Amino acid sequence: MANVSMRDMLKAGVHFGHQTRFWNPKMKPYIFGARNKIHIINLEKTVPMFNDALSYMQHVASNKGKILFVGTKRAAAEAVKEAAINCGQYYVNHRWLGGMLTNWKTVRQSIKRLKDLETMSQDGTFEKLTKKEALVNTREMEKLEKGLGGIKNMGGLPDVLFVIDADHEHISIKEANNLGIPVVSVVDTNSNPDGVDYIVPGNDDAIRAVQLYLNTAAEAVKEARTAQVEAKDSDDFVEATE
């Protein structure tokens, strides 16, 4: 299983929280102390909590569940997309559109429009339009792809959210809570951990820390999916030889 060690976390700067004056007292159980007015996160708490979160995501993946990676801060956006694609899952990395989960019916219509436009761009329909019409359609397609490209093949609501910054992505967490969708989230010292089912206390700004969370989660999910395929293949083999 893709576990993370304390050394990995120290190297990535996971233990550096925010300035002490910006802290959220609800994060007190996960804070080791302060240094130069910066809160230091207790990695002895973070390591097992992150590994629990990874186990849960592996459980979801091994049951063919859908995991939605959420990270819309500019610094994390590309890493979020890469990690989700790497493990065959889904992502929102541009902007969380209000109602993305709670108003799925409308989102589904927008996804259908995006797929229709993609088909039109590939089957020569755009070439039959006037330049202006083709440009309008191309721009609409690009805008929809930016907002919904990471979930266009999700085919329904996700089974779990993996969020990089609980504070920045509070709307997505609230929507997941309203629908009873479990939330795994990195929670820094300035954030509110309420509404997060699997809290990962850690730095949510340092790109090395963000990449550590994302890459480890992607590897864990891939591992679980590979094991599931291998188990199915061995079941088929047993049936064939009986």
From Swiss-Prot:
UniProt keyword annotations, A-Z: Ribonucleoprotein, Ribosomal protein
Chain segments annotated as coiled-coil in the UniProt record: none
One protein family per Pfam: Ribosomal_S2
Cellular component, GO, one term: cytosolic small ribosomal subunit
InterPro entries xref list: Ribosomal_uS2, Ribosomal_uS2_bac/mit/plastid, Ribosomal_uS2_CS, Ribosomal_uS2_flav_dom_sf
Gene Ontology BP annotations: translation
Organism: Idiomarina loihiensis (strain ATCC BAA-735 / DSM 15497 / L2-TR)
Name recorded for this polypeptide: Small ribosomal subunit protein uS2
Ribosomal protein recorded as keyword: yes
Lineage: Bacteria, Pseudomonadati, Pseudomonadota, Gammaproteobacteria, Alteromonadales
